[in-house]
Regions:
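A conserved hydrophobic secondary-structure block that centers on an alpha-helix together
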Residues: 1, 33, 58-61, 66, ...
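Short beta-to-alpha linker loops that shape the active-site pocket of alpha/beta-hydrolase fold enzymes
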Residues: 1-2, 357-361
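Core alpha/beta catalytic barrel or barrel-like domain that forms the active/cofactor pocket
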Residues: 2, 19-22, 26, 90-98
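Short, solvent-exposed loop/turn and secondary-structure capping segments
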Residues: 2-12, 78-80, 92, 101-105, ...
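Alpha/beta-hydrolase active-site loop
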Residues: 6-58, 366-410, 473
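Primarily recognizes the serine-hydrolase "nucleophile elbow" in alpha/beta-hydrolase
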Residues: 42, 49-114, 400-477
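Catalytic-domain carbohydrate-binding cleft regions of carbohydrate-active enzymes
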Residues: 64-88, 92-93, 99-107, 111, ...
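Alpha/beta-hydrolase-fold serine-hydrolase catalytic core, especially in secreted/extracellular enzymes
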Residues: 126, 133-321, 327-352, 359-410, ...
Length: 519
């Protein structure tokens, strides 16, 4: 962190207009977050490279590598242990708990702890030896909240005694001599050092300053807090990732095993876990040419609800089109309340049309999303623990799709095929939903309106999505979505989705999309 400086690494508080731009952006900006570029990620990379260095030393036994650290160092200990398989033992200090998860900006990253936390991160190291401790801080309840779960997990491997907790609630936040003795004991036992226990620290002669000084006249320290370095580093990281991801997009294996899992990760919910959905307050009425069913779908698994308006034909074919635009459940109707002609054609041909108010969608139009209250404008403080609104709207599409495809009693018509159409801001939502649901959605018509996550200048924008730009932005979504029949408007370059049908110039997008869906 020398080149970036402590004000950026540890004390960041306010968004920087000069670093918030579509080219040459800085850390904590919407562009950096859309590319999953973070201080925590850089520190974890530094930790991995430190292991690389250690393994070049002839005196290092590669089978006995351990990591330990306290507080923020405890966070890095957990992250390195979770991501680097070369480590044999981990000892995070005053960090693992079910309470506060890491207060510094360097300990947080968007997506990191959504529906998860430090206990689960520590659990990723199982069944390898791991120790931790408690103090009179946020870890003080660990003996009853978190540690028993780790013991149970280790017990599944038959290694319950491979995870230990040193109690020390009478000490403040620390890595004191008593705590260090606990680490020494775990290290001695599992690395078979053969030392007499307990291991007591002894006085030692510190190395002279010249022996432990990194920077000197021959090796001058780099400039600290260098904005040009920061911009250049993030630009290189973006370029390096793009080269690899573009290569992946060219092969079926890359699309299915690189891009699709990444999209599922940033959306935060695979379709297989869409949830148990019911329609308890469905109300159906006959209209001149169709049945109209209204009400709320309730996703019992996640405590979510989606208000829908489902227009069902008299002679259904078993196909339903989920039709999304920025007007929510009013998307099927013109200003006078009549059904849009292209959708009436779908209904007359036996295709159901379902519109919905996705999360926080109303006729007022949301300008900014909610964030966790606090003085520091760090996106990870909100989106490291909560789904972005964009992702939640994709979840709603999954809820609708899951309900439609789940067999049920005869009170609702059987659905054999679900298609999807999205326009306005909902175009990108539809693209993401199609990409994240595999073959559950048979056909998709998407008007992107040229939208790109990487063009957003506000991390509170309703369209903001952590990681949204990293995996080739909206064209990356369309690339994965094109595994099934896909119609696209708003795009001029179809290199990443050559099998898709592109809108012809001059045609109304909704009319053209409806006609394509009928083919």
């Amino acid at each position: 962190s020398k080149q970036l400086g402590p004000d950026i690494i540890h004390k960041f508080a306010k968004q920087r207009p000069e670093m918030n731009r579509t080219e040459g952006w800085g850390l904590y900006s919407p562009q950096a977050e859309a590319n999953l570029q973070s201080v925590m990620g850089l520190q974890t990379l530094n930790s991995i490279r430190s292991v690389d260095f250690l393994l070049t030393l002839p005196e290092v036994d590669p089978t006995r590598l351990a990591v330990t650290g306290s507080s923020g160092g405890g966070t890095q200990t957990m992250l390195l242990a979770a991501t680097d398989p070369r480590l044999a033992l981990s000892y995070p200090v005053v960090m693992v708990s079910t309470a506060m998860q890491g207060g510094c900006s360097c300990e947080n990253a968007t997506l990191l702890r959504v529906n998860s936390g430090n206990v689960e991160i520590a659990a990723l190291f199982a069944p390898k030896p791991q120790g931790m401790n408690t103090a009179n801080d946020w870890t003080k309840e660990m003996s009853t909240k978190g540690f028993p779960d780790l013991q149970k997990l280790y017990g599944l491997y038959g290694k319950k005694d491979f995870v230990t907790l040193q109690r020390g609630e009478h000490f403040p936040h620390n890595y004191n001599a008593v705590t260090r003795m606990g680490f020494y004991d775990v290290l001695n036992r599992h690395f078979k050092l053969g030392l007499e226990s307990p291991i007591v620290e002894k006085d030692y002669a510190p190395l002279p300053k010249e022996k432990i000084t990194v920077w000197d006249d021959a090796h001058p320290a780099p400039k600290s807090g260098d904005p040009d370095f920061e911009r250049g580093l993030l630009k290189w990281l973006k370029s390096d990732a793009q080269k690899q991801l573009l290569a992946a997009a060219k092969t079926p294996e890359g699309r299915e095993h690189v891009l699709r899992p990444a999209i599922e990760a940033i959306i935060g919910r695979p379709f297989a876990q869409a949830g148990k959905v019911g329609f308890p307050d469905a109300s159906t009425q006959w209209r001149d040419s169709h049945f109209r069913t209204q009400g709320r779908l309730l996703n019992a698994t996640y405590g979510e609800e989606v208000t829908i308006d489902w227009l069902q034909p008299i002679n259904p074919t078993g196909e339903v089109v989920i039709w999304l635009d920025d007007s929510g459940k009013g998307a099927a109707r013109l200003a006078d309340g009549s059904i849009r002609p292209e959708l009436q054609e779908l209904i007359d041909r036996g295709v159901g049309v379902l519109t919905a108010d996705l999360f926080l969608q109303d006729d007022k139009g949301l300008k900014q999303t909610r964030v966790v209250p606090g003085p520091r404008e760090v996106p990870a403080y909100t989106f490291g623990y909560n789904h972005a609104l964009f992702a939640q709207r994709v979840h709603d599409v999954m809820t609708i799709t899951s309900y439609l495809l789940t067999p049920r009693d005869s009170s609702q018509p059987a659905v054999k095929k679900v298609s999807l159409a999205g326009f306005g801001q909902m175009g990108a939502v539809a693209a993401a939903a199609r990409a994240a649901t595999g073959n559950a959605i048979a056909k998709a018509a998407v008007d992107t309106g040229t939208f790109r996550f990487g063009q957003l200048l506000d991390y509170r924008d309703p369209m903001f999505l952590p990681g949204g730009s990293k995996y080739l932005d909206v064209p990356g979504l369309l690339c994965v979505a094109s595994a099934q029949p896909l119609w696209v408007a708003g795009e001029t370059d179809a290199a990443l989705f050559p099998t898709a049908t592109l809108q012809k110039d001059g045609m109304d997008a909704k009319t053209a999309a409806a006609a394509w869906l009928l083919k």
